[in-house]
Amino acid sequence: MLLFQKTLSRVAAPISVAANLILILLIIFKSPAQMGNYKYLLIGLSIFEMSYAVLDVVSETTVLSIKKSFVVVVPYKDRSFGQETAMDINLIYCGFFGFSMGMFVVIFAYRSFLTTGNTILRKFEGFKIISWFAYPLFYAIVWILVAWGPLASFPEMDIVVRPFLLDELNMTVDEVAYTGRLFYSTIDNSLRYSAILTGVLQWVLTASSLFLVIFFGLRCYFHYGKLVQLTDVQSIRLRQLQNQLFLALVCQATVPLILMHIPVTILYTCCVLNIVFNPFSVATTIALFPAIDPLPTIFIVKNYRVALFEFVCPSCLCWSETLKHMGSNRITSYRSNTVNALSM
């Protein structure tokens, strides 16, 4: 199973890099003028996802469920770096997970402010939009500090982890760098409050990010309903673009929700209930996230989809346009014949 996970990561990483590079080029050269600074947020998201994919391959991270605990493991046995570097990679990996939670809040918030005409966006014109990344960076810092402090390895944890590392990875605690949460002490079965409190903190941040995504998403949705009443050509085009971007954003936000946040939430719950959760499902689904996430924007936004088809298969696009014109002519002819028949 570990071999499958490594293979999947090595396959998903180049797909992620290629897909996100394509999306970045499409955003730079094929974005409608109405997108404004929103395109910089999308570029930032693509850069983050490429970095996540590369980190996943470099780290070879594994998540092990160990009844009352779980551990994030970065092996350094027979590799070009030692324990200290492996621990740094482990912390960065945890930070990237936290960053992903805050990132979609920022994008949904920007779309909400943009569609409702909030004047606050005028303060972030041009490259000032980069300051919006401070919010997901805050999430990343919290996850890193929690992993570095309360979730760092300690002697009691080593005793718990040692047999599982040997069985699952054929490694010892001296050949890996790991972070993990031990909810119950193995000595007297008492609660470890440092693990509980930091778990509550991370749960609150996770729940708040989900709440904000839903809140800003609903604001966008209800405002789009008002755009339906506008009938001039420019407003119709704007409405179509806004709908495409919103649908793409919803799909993009659903991908990490299904592949990352729900599995990790289940993992936390299983640890509290002393249930072993499939150790490879979490790391495997996380590896898929950066490869799948850019696809909705590429194929839902018309400008990007058409530009990609023009490059990959120009003849296919020509046939599509021909069929579209043929269908349009038939409808026009049918309407004309119907009107003539009624007039007679």
Curated annotation (Swiss-Prot):
The chain crosses the membrane at residues 11-31, 40-60, 89-109, 129-149, 196-216, 257-277, 280-300. It is a multi-pass membrane protein. Disruption phenotype: Lack of sensitivity of ADL neurons to N,N-diethyl-meta-toluamide (DEET) with no effect on average pause length of worms following DEET exposure in contrast to wild-type worms which show a marked increase. Does not affect AWC neuron activity in response to DEET. It is found in: Cell membrane. InterPro entries: 7TM_GPCR_serpentine_rcpt_Str. Coiled coil: none annotated. Expressed in the ADL chemosensory neurons. Its main location: membrane. One of its GO terms (cellular component) is plasma membrane. Keywords: Cell membrane, G-protein coupled receptor, Glycoprotein, Membrane, Receptor, Transducer, Transmembrane, Transmembrane helix. Mediates sensitivity to N,N-diethyl-meta-toluamide (DEET), the most widely used insect repellent worldwide. Probable G-protein coupled receptor. Belongs to the nematode receptor-like protein str family. This is G-protein coupled receptor str-217.
